[in-house]
Amino acid sequence: MNQPIAAIGISDSTRPKTNVRLTISAEHLMDTDVFSKSDPICLVYEKTSGKKATTTEPVQVPTWQDSQWTERGRTEVVMNNLNPQFTKTFLLPYFFEETQLLRFEIYDADSPNVGQDLSPHDFLGRFECVLAQIVSYSTLKAHLGKAEGIGAQWRNKDKNTRTGSITIRAEEDEKCEKIQFDVCGEGLDKKDFFGKSDPYLNFKRKFDDGSAHLVHRTEVKQKTLDPRWATVQINTQTLCGKDGERPIIIECYDHDKWKKGEEPRGEAKFSRDDHIGTAHTTLNELLRGGAGDPVELLLTNEKKKAKKGDKYKCSGTLKIWNSKIIVEPTFLDFISGGTQLEFAVAVDFTASNGAPKNSSSLHYMSADRPNQYELALRSVLSICQHYNSSKTFEAFGFGAKLPNSVSVSAIFSLDLLRGTPEVVGISGVMSAYRHALQNVQLYGPTNFAPIIDTVAQKAQNMIHDSARYQILLIITDGIISDMHATIRSIINASGLPLSIIIIGVGNEDFEKMHELDSDDSLLQQDSRIAQRDIVQFVTIREFLNNGRGVYLDPDVVQENLAREVLFEVPGQLTGYMKQRGFQPRPVENPWTRNSPPPDYDPVLDGIGRRAQAPSPGFQMPVASAPPMY
């Protein structure tokens, strides 16, 4: 199975990114002009948390706003129109693993040229949301808020208000284009003294400065000088920037096995491999292998060539055929088509966490700082809530004795009052966690298999279409007690619509836990091999301080942790859908999106904020925080 190069840490250059284009229109805007209609312009801001994340400098904005909002751009002025359809669009990077908060403000322009100072122009309204909400619905309509109001998402039964409405449409700017081809080697140089080589290929993108970057590696073929690798697929943007003539480097290596127990993790395990030869090509040349005869590329070993001189011919030949460009459905295609992400969380209540009333306990509730479990829960759920229209989660605990019970519960509903795992919103998860902490007896052991099997059973009911995909978050303080059973459960679940995120809290040595996160090779046990990699494991301590012993703000910890644990989810979802042959539903006819329960309060989950008192001079009522459904 071909494997992409695993990311080591996450930088802006390596994180999966999609560009989305926003188109904006408005209706029934206020008319603030005496002798004509308003001349609206829309400004788009992003909450950047003090980081440089935009292309322009901050503009002057109303005084109630803070300096962390940065302008991403502005539309043209549409003259004399209360229902403008702006032609200027906005191209924004979209990251699944980030909360990208946007603000849309509409003004009645006092002149065709709107400068940095906005005070001469009448303010018509604003709307705040996260980019995830827009892409989840493809088209998002909302009431505009006046004064300090932030607007409210439009519901089916709503009527027009005096402030008017805004409609934002999101489209993926470019689809995921890949080149697919078959490749084999013939007559490769023999590198092993006692046997044949174990060859694999590296595909590298060459940059203008002469440097090269590894973008794809094939599997290793054992003991052969005439290997045939599995069909290769590489994103053309990653491979060559979609430039048909940009040089592409293909390296062939003989893999040297390490002694059992000595093999390093990651790229280090390829560090002592022998170079067989290198070929140079382009995207256009590779595509010629799709019509007629295969493309033949000679492998050259410069050291061997220099040594043998004119007697040197080559170090083998690569043949490439069945080449073609394919466009696969993307994560946003499925999300825009109504695919819902279902979420379950499981919290470790074993005694090794320490007595909750003790300040050294990992479950200790501090008045001024969240504990590591709370940080982990909010980090993941604050992102994931936008991809589940029902705003409900399943919350479990494990490794504790429940009230009036003499036996340990391998798995139990976190909501002890209702006895059901389903809770509403992040606030529901946090309330259930705190209540359980006060009423259960921490015990043990740390077993993962029961919770994985329980959630996998639910995922089993989702295998018939692309309507739902399950994610399980497990938070634990130590090494699991049932490693063999857990590996078996993960392998059993690897063919289901399921991703598992494991976050380690505390200072335990989690080295063995990395066995579950099989980035380098698929998880296996005895003769059974997982169908795909569905586990992501990280330790939270890596994100708690800046490396110099200074603890970071909890919001920063949550943001960085979410980036690390969630960035693989889009690829896991699309990988599963491809494996099953599922296509996304069209945007015009999406899967049904369920509404939240009547008692759901988005403000408690950090979506929006309470309406504030209007500034002096404003007569319009202030819109409440948006119920995001």
Curated annotation (Swiss-Prot):
<feature type="region of interest" description="Disordered">
    <location>
        <begin position="607"/>
        <end position="629"/>
    </location>
</feature>
<feature type="binding site">
    <location>
        <position position="274"/>
    </location>
    <ligand>
        <name>Ca(2+) 4</name>
    </ligand>
</feature>
<feature type="binding site">
    <location>
        <position position="198"/>
    </location>
    <ligand>
        <name>Ca(2+) 3</name>
    </ligand>
</feature>
<dbReference type="Pfam" id="PF00168">
    <property type="entry name" value="C2"/>
</dbReference>
<feature type="binding site">
    <location>
        <position position="122"/>
    </location>
    <ligand>
        <name>Ca(2+) 2</name>
    </ligand>
</feature>
<comment type="subunit">
    <text>Interacts with nicotinic acetylcholine receptor.</text>
</comment>
<dbReference type="GO" id="GO:0097120">
    <property type="term" value="P:receptor localization to synapse"/>
</dbReference>
<feature type="domain" description="VWFA">
    <location>
        <begin position="342"/>
        <end position="561"/>
    </location>
</feature>
<feature type="binding site">
    <location>
        <position position="110"/>
    </location>
    <ligand>
        <name>Ca(2+) 2</name>
    </ligand>
</feature>
<feature type="binding site">
    <location>
        <position position="192"/>
    </location>
    <ligand>
        <name>Ca(2+) 4</name>
    </ligand>
</feature>
<feature type="binding site">
    <location>
        <position position="33"/>
    </location>
    <ligand>
        <name>Ca(2+) 1</name>
    </ligand>
</feature>
<feature type="binding site">
    <location>
        <position position="192"/>
    </location>
    <ligand>
        <name>Ca(2+) 3</name>
    </ligand>
</feature>
<feature type="binding site">
    <location>
        <position position="39"/>
    </location>
    <ligand>
        <name>Ca(2+) 1</name>
    </ligand>
</feature>
<feature type="domain" description="C2 2">
    <location>
        <begin position="162"/>
        <end position="299"/>
    </location>
</feature>
<dbReference type="GO" id="GO:0046872">
    <property type="term" value="F:metal ion binding"/>
</dbReference>
<keyword id="KW-0106">Calcium</keyword>
<feature type="binding site">
    <location>
        <position position="256"/>
    </location>
    <ligand>
        <name>Ca(2+) 4</name>
    </ligand>
</feature>
<dbReference type="Pfam" id="PF07002">
    <property type="entry name" value="Copine"/>
</dbReference>
<dbReference type="InterPro" id="IPR045052">
    <property type="entry name" value="Copine"/>
</dbReference>
<comment type="function">
    <text>Exhibits calcium-dependent phospholipid binding properties. May function in membrane trafficking. Regulates synaptic levels of nicotinic acetylcholine receptor subunit lev-1 and unc-38 in the nerve cord. Involved in nicotinic acetylcholine receptor (nAChR)-mediated sensitivity to nicotine and levamisole. Affects directional sperm motility.</text>
</comment>
<keyword id="KW-0479">Metal-binding</keyword>
<protein>
    <recommendedName>
        <fullName>Nicotinic receptor-associated protein 1</fullName>
    </recommendedName>
</protein>
<feature type="binding site">
    <location>
        <position position="254"/>
    </location>
    <ligand>
        <name>Ca(2+) 4</name>
    </ligand>
</feature>
<dbReference type="InterPro" id="IPR000008">
    <property type="entry name" value="C2_dom"/>
</dbReference>
<feature type="binding site">
    <location>
        <position position="108"/>
    </location>
    <ligand>
        <name>Ca(2+) 2</name>
    </ligand>
</feature>
<feature type="binding site">
    <location>
        <position position="33"/>
    </location>
    <ligand>
        <name>Ca(2+) 2</name>
    </ligand>
</feature>
<dbReference type="InterPro" id="IPR010734">
    <property type="entry name" value="Copine_C"/>
</dbReference>
<dbReference type="InterPro" id="IPR037768">
    <property type="entry name" value="C2B_Copine"/>
</dbReference>
<feature type="binding site">
    <location>
        <position position="254"/>
    </location>
    <ligand>
        <name>Ca(2+) 3</name>
    </ligand>
</feature>
<dbReference type="InterPro" id="IPR036465">
    <property type="entry name" value="vWFA_dom_sf"/>
</dbReference>
<dbReference type="GO" id="GO:0005886">
    <property type="term" value="C:plasma membrane"/>
</dbReference>
<comment type="similarity">
    <text>Belongs to the copine family.</text>
</comment>
<feature type="binding site">
    <location>
        <position position="110"/>
    </location>
    <ligand>
        <name>Ca(2+) 1</name>
    </ligand>
</feature>
<feature type="binding site">
    <location>
        <position position="256"/>
    </location>
    <ligand>
        <name>Ca(2+) 3</name>
    </ligand>
</feature>
<dbReference type="InterPro" id="IPR035892">
    <property type="entry name" value="C2_domain_sf"/>
</dbReference>
<dbReference type="GO" id="GO:0005544">
    <property type="term" value="F:calcium-dependent phospholipid binding"/>
</dbReference>
<dbReference type="InterPro" id="IPR002035">
    <property type="entry name" value="VWF_A"/>
</dbReference>
<keyword id="KW-0677">Repeat</keyword>
<feature type="binding site">
    <location>
        <position position="108"/>
    </location>
    <ligand>
        <name>Ca(2+) 1</name>
    </ligand>
</feature>
<feature type="region of interest" description="Disordered">
    <location>
        <begin position="581"/>
        <end position="600"/>
    </location>
</feature>
<feature type="domain" description="C2 1">
    <location>
        <begin position="1"/>
        <end position="144"/>
    </location>
</feature>
<keyword id="KW-1003">Cell membrane</keyword>
